[in-house]
């Protein structure tokens, strides 16, 4: 497990949803590498969270590990490592915190090349053009490279590095170093340098080479920009694997789907489309007026023949009239459907509620629900069950009933 402890986007991790309620950690430590954030001001958030956990045995286990992880760690990286170990303690999971002097030492040659020659910018720009030329000229890169794709870290902040002529500047500070001073700083204190989002993959594969890299769609999008950069550094580029996605359906939810005769495939339709489809299926009248359009086409086909024999200038008016009649039929069809939905409002409401249950806030569960909600109900067996059924090399969206 690669712990992104050098990421700076605190906003992305400072809150989570639990049973529909937002729990947020407000801290003044923003702007620094998130792994180094201290936990002194986290206790009120943990107290609030634990109030919602209840008193089940699984809840007491969670409280114990929250205390071990988040109440007894010096920073967020240490706490995260402990909690991930708790979740996957039976699976020999390797946790890598790359914000480390010895690991950074291995990456000094690549960082020195970046400082001196700015090769990341050049190679990523070249690869982006290759993608546009070979696959899609409208391709929009997920990430745009900077001239220097490294940050300089301090205990409280991180700074972009800018090079002008023979000197390096830390943006938003008055620090200025010559090339020799900057390279000496890198050699003596590699832990003070941090790769940005484009150089981080190279760092990752330098210290822990992988046959494959598993990531989300957004992550893979910028990895596609990097194979030329990897070649430049003689680092093997891994096979890119899209991570699993799954929908978890409880037995109760599955029964609701069966009662409404909704397939799991139809669950993924937009809510309006799903409801319209089911209303058409369960109605005792045919709401499809497509047959009227076909009749119109036949009748106007006859008129087209007359126009061709008399005055072809009427052809435009004829086509306009056909379009007008078709729009009228479509409007009538929509009104019939709306009337039927009002008549079957109980079924519409049940389908609406069920769809909201499956896709909270109109989003995938993985974007809204917290793993703790499932752990409370099933304990550690929840993780074990997922490990058994998820196939990392399946190219399908999994629907798991539990």
Regions found by a protein language model. Name each.
Residues 65-70, 203-212, 333-337, 401-402:
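Glycine- and acidic
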Residues 10-16, 248-281:
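A structural-propensity feature for long, helix-poor, extended segments
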Residues 16-44:
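A glycine-rich helix N-cap at a beta->alpha junction
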Residues 141-211, 217-228, 237-239, 244-252, ...:
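A translation/RNA-centric and nucleic-acid-associated enzymatic feature enriched
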Residues 46-69:
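Residues forming anionic-ligand binding surfaces in small-molecule and nucleic-acid pockets
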Residues 1-9, 238:
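Glycine-rich phosphate/pyrophosphate-binding loops
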Residues 8-17, 107-111:
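Short acidic, glycine/serine/threonine-rich loops at helix termini
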Residues 83-177, 181, 273, 277-402:
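Long, compositionally biased intrinsically disordered regions
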């Amino acid at each position: 497990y690669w712990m992104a402890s050098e990421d700076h986007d605190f906003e992305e991790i400072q809150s989570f949803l639990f049973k529909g309620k937002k729990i947020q950690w407000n801290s003044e430590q923003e702007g620094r590498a998130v792994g180094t954030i201290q936990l002194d001001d986290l206790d009120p958030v943990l107290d609030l969270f634990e109030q919602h956990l209840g008193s089940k045995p699984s809840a007491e286990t969670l409280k114990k590990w929250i205390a071990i992880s988040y109440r007894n760690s010096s920073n967020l990286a240490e706490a995260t490592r402990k909690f991930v170990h708790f979740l996957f303690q039976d699976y020999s999971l390797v946790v890598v915190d790359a914000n480390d002097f010895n690991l950074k030492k291995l990456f000094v040659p690549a960082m020195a090349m970046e400082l001196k020659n700015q090769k990341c910018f050049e190679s990523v720009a070249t690869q982006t053009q290759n993608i546009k030329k070979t696959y899609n000229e409208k391709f929009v890169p997920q990430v745009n490279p900077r001239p220097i794709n490294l940050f300089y870290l301090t205990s409280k902040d991180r700074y972009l590095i800018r090079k002008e002529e023979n000197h390096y500047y830390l943006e938003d500070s008055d620090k200025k170093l010559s090339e020799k001073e900057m390279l000496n700083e890198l050699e003596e204190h590699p832990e003070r340098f941090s790769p940005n989002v484009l150089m981080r993959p190279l760092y990752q594969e330098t210290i822990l080479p992988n046959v494959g890299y598993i990531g989300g769609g957004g992550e893979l999008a910028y990895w596609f920009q990097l194979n030329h950069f990897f070649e430049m550094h003689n680092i093997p580029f891994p096979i890119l694997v899209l991570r699993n996605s799954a929908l978890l359906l409880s037995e109760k939810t599955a029964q609701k789907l069966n009662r409404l005769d909704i397939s799991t495939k139809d669950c993924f339709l937009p809510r309006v489309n799903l409801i319209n489809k089911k209303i058409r299926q369960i109605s005792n009248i045919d709401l499809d007026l497509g047959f009227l359009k076909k009749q119109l086409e036949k009748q106007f086909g006859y008129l087209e023949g007359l126009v061709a024999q008399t005055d072809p200038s009427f052809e435009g008016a004829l086509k306009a009239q056909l379009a007008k009649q078709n729009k009228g039929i479509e409007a009538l069809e929509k009104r019939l459907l709306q009337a039927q939905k009002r008549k079957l409002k109980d079924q519409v409401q049940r389908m609406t509620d069920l769809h909201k249950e499956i896709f909270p806030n109109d989003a995938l569960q993985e974007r809204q629900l917290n793993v703790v909600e499932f752990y409370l109900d099933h304990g550690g067996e929840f993780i074990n069950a997922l490990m058994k059924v998820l196939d990392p090399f399946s190219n399908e969206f999994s629907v798991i009933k539990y």
